[in-house]
Amino acid sequence: MAIMQAAKALFLEHGFGAVSMDQIARQATVSKATVYAHFTSKEKLFAEMVFSACTSNWNGEMPQLTADSDIIAKLEETLRFVMEHLLSPEPLSVYRIIMAEGPRFPELPKAFFGNGPLPMIRKLSDFFEQANKYRLLDVPNPRLAAEQAIWLVRGPIGIRRLLDMDVPADFPAEDDYLQGAVQMIYRSFRPAGN
C-alpha cells in the first residue's frame, strides 16, 4: 500500500514528530483525505507502520540440523542469519524510533519485542535444542544461550550502527568478529569428549 510505504520511509528517516500527514499524502501521491480514510490519525498510522515493520523484518528460517551436520558450519550460518537480521538498516531504524517514541506509544516496545526479538530468540533456542537432540552441542539452557548469542552477535558492531558511529579501524572485520563468536559459543557448549 502506497500510504504505508510512504509513512514507513518518512517516519524511519525523520521520526514521528517531524512528519506530517500532508508529507505522507504527497509522498504516497494520494490526497490527505485518502490518508485519513485509511488511518484516522497520524498516531494510528505510525503504530500500524511500526507493527508492520516489526513483523516483516524477522521473517525467514534458520538453518536446520541433522545428526551428521557440521555444527561449526551450521552455527556460523545460523549466527550470520541472526547478525544480518539484527544489523541491517531497517531493523536498526525501527529500533531507534521505538526507543525515541516508546514513552509516547507504550504499546510499541512490547509489540516490537513480541514480533521481532522474541521470534528470533525462539528460533535460535530451537536451533540449540536440535543441537542437543543430535548431541552436536551440550546446551543446558537453550533459551538463555539464544539470548546470550544474540547479544554477543549484536555486540559492539550493533551498538555503533545503532548510534550511527563508525566501527574503529582496529576492530575486527564483521566476518572475523562472527568467527570469534562462533568459536566462543562452540567452546562453551562443546559436548564432552569433543
Question: Where would I find each of the regions flagged by the language model?
Answer:
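Amphipathic alpha-helical packing segments from all-alpha helical-bundle domains
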Residues: 84, 88, 93, 97, ...
